[in-house]
């Protein structure tokens, strides 16, 4: 059960203390308080854990300072969609909005290689009106002898270049809690010229200690990628780990499923799960066409497979796209064969816009149909 308080019901407000005191006297009930502190107001939620079936919802709603009470299922307690649950489906970070109702493109380098290529990528993004990117500093690899990323050494100049070209958010994978510390320190030392969305990759989705540590910090949002060898339910529960520790600013990423039936693609494209995740949870949903397809193969119509699956995800309602680009893919240190060219960026963005417009038209059509039927 979630008790949602009226805005700005903080610890110093008498009604806040009275509500907690009232709940403290309920047998077999524990409380956990979560606050979202914004520029305009503070929102407070009290999570009740235990024998909530015995609680009188109307009695709690009658308390001064309570806006409403939501009964929730055991599944996805924090992030799930529950009956009568009108909590928001997104968040804002560093001036960029992430929600189930909009779309952001994160085009960039799968792995940071050198300042020249990073600057070329960032300039192309700025020239095409983009404020988000992906930049890999830490690269978990299947082969121990493969390039593992430049790590903390590249962070200062990557952040400074991002700030120079107006990039507001960089999606950056971490594989260890020390990487979180290194990113926070580099942001501080460079004067925070940009922002970082921490990416937890498919290999670490069940690294529960890492999830807890990342969840306890609420400064940086998180992109959590689906695990390639586990069920969707298990992956969504990993997101609950993050949220239960306090960080609700989570985007859930679909990146294809590992299976021998995906050939000739790298993974089996799972973008049909975009509406499923949005139905089950309040998280925005990201698609990663580059790691789903893994090649630059082209269909007879002249369009790349990556473009086709991107459109599939967008027209299904995706809210974020993580896609690989590189100035010189043949020289990329990681995943060069799947990287798009900088000259393809304007085309890619226009193609995404067409798919998004089609999605919006489908939504409008559905609303008209439902209104007429009702």
Language model regions located:
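Catalytic alpha/beta core domains of metabolic enzymes, predominantly
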Residues: 93, 206-325
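Glycine-rich, proline-tolerant flexible connector loops at the mouths of alpha/beta enzymes
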Residues: 134-152, 325-336
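Hydrophobic faces of well-ordered beta-strands that scaffold small-molecule active sites
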Residues: 103-109, 131-135, 169-172, 196-200, ...
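Active-site mouth loops of central-metabolism enzymes
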Residues: 103-120, 143-149, 169-174, 199-202, ...
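Non-catalytic terminal accessory/regulatory regions of metabolic enzymes
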Residues: 1-106
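N-terminal small/glycine-rich loop or linker at the start of catalytic domains
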Residues: 91-110, 141, 282-295
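Alpha-helix-loop-beta-strand connector modules within alpha/beta enzyme cores
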Residues: 148-172, 214-221, 271-287, 316, ...
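N-terminal active-site wall of soluble small-molecule enzyme domains
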Residues: 140-195, 207-209
